Amino acid sequence: MRDNMLQVDHHDPENLSLLRFNALWESNYRNNSLLVFSTGRSPTLYKELRKEKPMLTPDITIMSVGTEITYGNSMVPDNGWVEFLNKKWDRNIVSEETSKFPELSLQSETEQRPHKVSFYVQKDKAQDVMKALATRLQERGLDVKIIYSGGMDLDILPQGAGKGQALAYLLKKFKASNKLPVNTLACGDSGNDAELFSIPDVHGVMVSNAQEELLQWHAANAKNNPKIIHATERCAAGIIQAIGHFNLGPSTSPRDVTDLSDSKMENFDPAYEVVKLYLFYERWRRAEVENFELYLANLKAVCCLSGIFVHPSGIEQSLHDAINSLKTCYGDKQGKQFRVWVDQVLPAQIGSESWLVSFKKWEQSGEAWSTLY
């Protein structure tokens, strides 16, 4: 599980850290792991972020500070979670009581959700407001949780809500269906991520750019917990660092591999080969490939002579011809902000030596994005 805000580094205009993670996940983890995005953002702001940044498609999305859980591309809501959060929750009472605090400034309408009421509050007033508000709401018969994060955001949720509780709910659900993950890595950077690290048997990483309130929580509650680390890398790079630190699996992104030409049939992995192919394609068009003839030869070696590349338009072309056609576009994006990444790489073996691989390919050239399925 990772917070989709923490993986996005707004100080990295080319999104290289995020693209490194994308390549690692799609080449090594997509087919046998679950990618969960957990964010304080509402569905509206989350979808806006996905339009701005090269983010992968998660298997599960947790939004609005753990009050909304959805599944898959269609973001199907978890109705069981909704029913659970309705207990001892009355949004009208919350709105009535918070209106009595002039220190609170209501956030935009998009951030107000069925089980989340969100405000801005000055840092020096936050603790006093939270204490007084909690007392008022308890006196009104509500059981709520008040979360302060980002040095200004104050969210009021049902007591059973939150990123940590949402994760615990999912793990319980997986266990009941005998699908409990072998390992779970929770990643965070703000105060509303703290409870993620309180879930038993979960590995945790605070990225190097974690905010003050999360660092304070760590110092007070988990400083000597070996399952929780403070990474030295920012954002998505910190997640990669944690995967390596806890030995959870491969932690070298294909984007960190200089020579992509080495393809050994005994270690053949179709997902890894697809990721490598489009990394090569990016470098090829940016004129960053040396010894390209050797790479093309190795690429053909792992492709069956009868292999077919099916374009999203439906046009079929032999894999070898598709590889040869690369020669016509070498260096046409040299010096430009051109990046390529793949999403939802899903291989299926259809014969003893045959694979069908479906994926989405994205390209960014300057500010323009395009995709092929």
Model-derived regions, located:
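Active-site phosphate-binding/coordination module
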Residues: 15-111, 209
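Exposed beta-sheet edge and beta->alpha loop/turn motif
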Residues: 349-373
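Asp-based phosphoryl-transfer active-site loop
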Residues: 1-14, 197
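Conserved acidic, metal-coordinating active-site core of Asp-based
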Residues: 93-199
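Mg2+-dependent phosphoryl-transfer enzymes with acidic/Ser/Thr/Gly-rich catalytic loops
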Residues: 157, 164-266
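A solvent-exposed, acidic/Ser-Thr-rich amphipathic alpha-helical stretch
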Residues: 290-353
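Short structured motifs
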Residues: 102-103, 340-345, 358, 368
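Short, low-complexity N-terminal intrinsically disordered segments enriched in polar/charged residues
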Residues: 257-302
